[in-house]
Design a protein with these regions (language model features):
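Core dinuclear metal-dependent hydrolase active-site scaffold
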Residues: 4, 111-139, 178
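Divalent metal-coordination and catalytic microenvironments
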Residues: 5, 17, 55, 67, ...
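Active-site HxH/HxHxD metal-binding segment of metal-dependent hydrolases
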Residues: 13, 21-28, 32-120, 210-211
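A short, flexible beta-alpha/helix-coil linker loop
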Residues: 19-23, 150-151, 155-158
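Short active-site segment of divalent metal-dependent hydrolases/proteases
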Residues: 58, 133, 150, 192
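Accessory terminal helices/loops
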Residues: 80, 171-184, 188-272
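Active-site-adjacent loop/tail segments of enzyme domains
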Residues: 156-179
Length: 272
């Protein structure tokens, strides 16, 4: 889910978790999803201040540079992107051209950092577990939680990627649940839990505390870790994890072209 967050008292806005469409079979990218965001930005006359990533996504490519070139904004992510870059720089055997210092991004956020979207005040929570670099952006009374909490009837994000940790995710979720009960929670994905036929993306901290099927009603950490570990062992890798990681750890840029002018994505065999 991509969000556009607008200051009601000005045209200032931010884009959170953009998508570049990608067809694995043909190796072709498509900007349809990003162009819908651009059309909305232009129709509303928005002044984009930020293009934010909650983490290095493993299931879709980021359109951050495409959006930045067309509507502006600084690209931001958590400072622990360097951990992800080091981990997957080795997985994909990246050469020295691939910088592992996060310099591909305009801003590296740390826990407690603040930022502004016009008159809106934002602050950063470091919420690792799904990945080491996951952030939650708390903007006034809204929390954009990425892949930590999902809708209460679906639960929580997986933790079995390299650098993931069920213990860390549980602790991160407690940090989110410590926000005021009325805080609006905007999730990064929705999968329509069994018995629900429509997509949903907004809930509240109070609803999550009371109703989340994985962590609600004060479930202890050891029960959560056991459940999450057993559940993750049954999950297949996301279909786009290999292309997504190579692009997203570069802030949405493609790997450099080879001497024939073509850009390639690697497939490490028997690795993930």
């Amino acid at each position: 889910i991509t969000y556009v967050v607008k200051d009601p008292d000005s045209n200032a806005a931010a884009i959170i978790d953009s998508v570049l469409d990608f067809d694995y079979a043909s190796g072709r990218t498509d900007t349809r999803s990003a162009d819908e965001v651009i059309a909305h930005v232009k129709a509303e006359g928005l002044d984009i201040q930020w293009v934010l990533e909650t983490h290095v996504h493993a299931d879709h490519l980021s359109a951050a540079p495409y959006l930045q070139q067309r509507v502006g904004g600084k690209i931001g992510i958590g400072e622990k992107i360097t951990v992800v870059q080091n981990t997957f720089g080795k997985v994909f055997n990246e050469g020295t051209e691939f910088q592992r210092d996060g310099s591909q991004f305009d801003r590296l956020f740390v826990e407690g950092d603040t930022f502004e979207i016009g008159g809106l005040k934002g602050r950063v929570l470091h919420t690792p577990g799904h990945t080491p670099a996951c952030l939650t952006y708390v903007i006034e009374d809204a929390a954009f939680v990425g892949d930590t909490l999902f809708m209460p009837d679906f639960g929580t994000a997986r933790c079995d990627f390299p650098g993931g940790s069920a213990e860390a995710l549980y602790q991160s979720i407690q940090k989110i649940l410590a926000l005021p009960d009325e805080t609006r929670v905007f999730v990064g994905h929705d999968y329509k839990a069994p018995g629900r036929d429509t997509y949903a993306w907004e809930t509240t901290v109070g609803e999550q505390k009371a109703l989340n099927v994985h962590v609600g009603a004060g479930k202890p950490m050891e029960d959560f870790v056991r459940m999450r570990t057993e559940r993750d062992a049954t999950l297949a890798m996301p279909r786009l994890i290999i292309p997504s990681l190579q692009v997203n750890m570069r802030a949405g840029q493609m790997p450099p072209a080879e001497d024939n002018g073509k850009t390639y994505l690697k497939v490490p065999l028997n690795t993930l």
